[in-house]
Amino acid sequence: MAWSVADSRSLYGIRHWGAGYFDVGDSGNIVVRPNVRQRKEIDLYRLVRDLGGKGLDLPLLVRFPDILQDRVTRLCGAFDKAIAEQGYGNRYTAIYPIKVNQQEAVVKSIIATQDVSIGLEAGSKPELMAVLALAPKGCTIVCNGYKDREFIRLALIGERLGHQVFIVIEKESEVDLVIEESRKLEVRPNIGLRVRLSSLASSKWSDTGGEKGKFGLSAGQLISATDKLIAAGLGDCVRLMHFHMGSQIANIADYRLGFREAIRYFAELRALGLPVDHVDVGGGLGVDYDGTHSRNDSSINYDMAEYAHVIVSMLSEFCAENGIPHPRILSESGRAMTAHHAVLLMNVTDVERLPDTVAPIDKAEELSLPLRKLVELANLNDEELVTEIYYRASHCVSEVSEMYAEGRLSLQEKALAEDLHATLCRRLHNQLQASQRSQRQVYDELTDRLADKYFCNFSVFQSLPDTWAIDQVLPIMPVHRLAEQPTRRAVLQDLTCDSDGKLKQYVDQQSIESSMSVHEVKQGDEYLIAVFLVGAYQEILGDMHNLFGDTDSVNVYVREGGELEISGIEEHDTIEDMLRYVHLSPEDLLNRYEAKTRECDLNPEERSLYFAEFCRGLKQSSYLAV
């Protein structure tokens, strides 16, 4: 049966991780639906072509702010529905922690979402300065992180500007600072207390919670802090309890366990006479990056609706049992709000693959023993001995490598051994059955060995740092040609001079593989690949390894009537920009270039040509111009 776009949907799992925002169109190109209710589809391949006409180059980060607002609407809608179903006597406010992505367009889009209650969180003085400026009057602002006097003064000033600013005490030492600075400014603060839970959730970020967590007050510290605040006349200012179990919680059962402990703290604080009427459940709401809807670190076994139901129902039942008024619910679900809205696009610049065949060998009997064995194995076509042939061939290759290192084989002989082994492995791979348990290990080894290397125009460290740092899985697939069957498997390599500069995990149907299905790319072909769900943390965590800088980026909005609005175009960092960042003056470098061209035996025409090349080079992108 001929390959279809439905086969590509299944292969890459786009309908499992795409959350309705991404799909494969009938043309074989990826389509984006920024607002599911509008039903407007954007052909991603055509969009890249159009943006190229506006001077934007690959690699390119495309943001869809409409997705941000849809995510906020979905999140708030899930809580509103749970509140209505439970008859809960208070409201929900979604708090966006700007550390997840501090881009102005991101923050503005989130707080501009209509018909929802939205607030902001700051975890540092720079973030608080940004939040105080961007937040609309009356906005709920949560201040987390380590705090000094300046931080606390800024928060108190924010209160006077008409915001509802919660200063969350994370360390006992912050209590005295809040007392002293609130007296100096004569501002009654809104105070929150962060409790340190014993419960831990299983995730890549589980160490942000639990007893060994970096932040939060232990039971003893909580008592000490409340005693101090009451003694200082600020007991009535303690209005919020906060906890955080960790980011990307995969298993909803872990969350239930931790939340049960957290609401006990809420009851105890109320019993102390503190008017706590806000519960900030922190982060933890995950994203189904691999589409498996499981307990994998890169997935979640629940959705927004179940998450909201757990929180609202448990609070509702607990408050009813203990005669406590229902508190307002806050959550800091930044990852769930932002991950889907950004897509990284890159082009394949080169392909490296092992040979499919080897030329006929003359006088095989004159070859060295391990090479003769390889030739014999290559001619042995016994499907019952497939795994044994592989192990024997691998041993022969090891012998060849030893003999070459000892000077007993020539470079040509070593190259012949490598080609023979590659072609033999390709034949064996075709004969193996992945479904047979006895052959699965060899099948997987050969799949890895035979995968092509697709060199792509991007930097893992700059654009996808979590894939390197914590083995984060992100969905990756071709942007176009999806009506064609992909016939190759490849590992994507970046431009950096670093062996870690590659993507090691790929969503393949509903599993994670070490290579991905791709189409044949011949010399001169354009082949675009997209990495999805990069809107959370990746932009701000990216570093400048090998001095690769920011890519081109753009915001794409869908306006009423379905027309697209392109805005927020930001050009890539130039080589000059990157050198300045590491305190290398381009002006000084130009002077040095000029001096060096004069010191060499160059004629005036060559000197002028070379110097002009240096000048032009400083203005270019750090990425490849292809």
Swiss-Prot record:
Binding, substrate: V279, D280, V281, G282, G283, G284, L285, G286, V287, D288, Y289
GO terms (BP aspect): arginine catabolic process; putrescine biosynthetic process from arginine; spermidine biosynthetic process
Name of this protein: Biosynthetic arginine decarboxylase
Modified residues (N6-(pyridoxal phosphate)lysine): K99
HAMAP family named among the record's database cross-references: SpeA (MF_01417)
Molecular function terms from GO: arginine decarboxylase activity; metal ion binding
Organism, as annotated: Chromobacterium violaceum (strain ATCC 12472 / DSM 30191 / JCM 1249 / CCUG 213 / NBRC 12614 / NCIMB 9131 / NCTC 9757 / MK)
This protein's pathway: Amine and polyamine biosynthesis; agmatine biosynthesis; agmatine from L-arginine: step 1/1
